């Protein structure tokens, strides 16, 4: 669920860091797309200029229309996708923290979003308004394993990161720890 969970100040404050888009898999795919798109773009340029710009092959033998042109367009589209991936990583979209403070009786859920008026996503509430901690499990092709906070007068607030689902034992452990800390029930098992 999180990169780290910290309970301090006499067990009255629970702080959970949530990993956003700065995951290894995102770095991996952004790098692969950048390298592949650069290769396609250089192959297209090489076929047009009849100068070899690649180390591994000789694209000067390609006919520019249609092969070189299409490779150049694929390369440009791939570089646009790679730029998007690197910007999402740089902005750490989805990253943030969950903070539960029993001293002040408040809950603060914070996430980074896309640039604009909703760049900082903050949800503040009181601990007394929490009804339960809910576990959602859906198996299949696109499995969902997530923790939600059920608060009076609001829809369920997701607490876990998006992406790779947590193991069932980790999900149950985190959910039980949070429900125990807040003094509410754990639903969905």
UniProtKB/Swiss-Prot annotation:
What keywords are annotated for this sequence in UniProt? Membrane, Photosynthesis, Thylakoid, Transmembrane, Transmembrane helix
Task: Give start-end ranges for the coiled-coil region(s).
Answer: none
* One matching Pfam family: Ycf4
Give the location in the cell. Cellular thylakoid membrane
Q: Report the main location listed first in the record.
A: membrane
What family does this chain come from, according to its entry? Belongs to the Ycf4 family.
Cross-referenced PANTHER family: PHOTOSYSTEM I ASSEMBLY PROTEIN YCF4, PTHR33288
**Tree of life domain:** Bacteria
Q: Which GO terms describe its biological process?
A: photosynthesis
| Task of the protein | Seems to be required for the assembly of the photosystem I complex.
What this protein is called in its record is: Photosystem I assembly protein Ycf4
InterPro entries assigned to the protein according to its UniProt record, in alphabetical order: PSI_Ycf4_assembly
Q: Which organism is it from?
A: Nostoc punctiforme (strain ATCC 29133 / PCC 73102)
Membrane-spanning residues where? 29-49, 69-89
**Membrane topology type, per the record?**
Multi-pass membrane protein
């Amino acid at each position: 669920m999180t990169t780290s969970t910290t309970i301090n100040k006499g067990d009255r404050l629970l702080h959970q860091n949530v990993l956003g888009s700065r995951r290894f898999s995102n770095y991996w795919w952004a790098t692969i797309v950048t390298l592949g798109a650069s290769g396609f773009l250089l192959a297209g340029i090489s076929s047009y200029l009849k100068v070899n710009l690649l180390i591994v092959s000789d694209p000067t033998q390609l006919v520019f229309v249609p092969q070189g042109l299409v490779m150049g367009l694929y390369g440009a589209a791939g570089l646009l996708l790679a730029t998007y991936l690197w910007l999402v990583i740089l902005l750490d979209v989805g990253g943030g923290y969950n903070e539960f403070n029993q001293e002040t009786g408040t809950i603060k859920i914070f996430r980074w979003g896309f640039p604009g008026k909703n760049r900082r996503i903050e949800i503040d509430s009181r601990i007394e308004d929490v009804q339960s901690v809910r576990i959602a499990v859906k198996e299949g092709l696109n499995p969902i394993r997530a923790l939600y906070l059920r608060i009076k007068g609001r829809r369920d607030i997701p607490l876990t990161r998006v992406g790779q689902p947590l193991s069932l034992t980790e999900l149950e452990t985190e959910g039980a720890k949070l429900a125990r800390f807040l003094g509410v029930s754990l639903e969905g098992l």
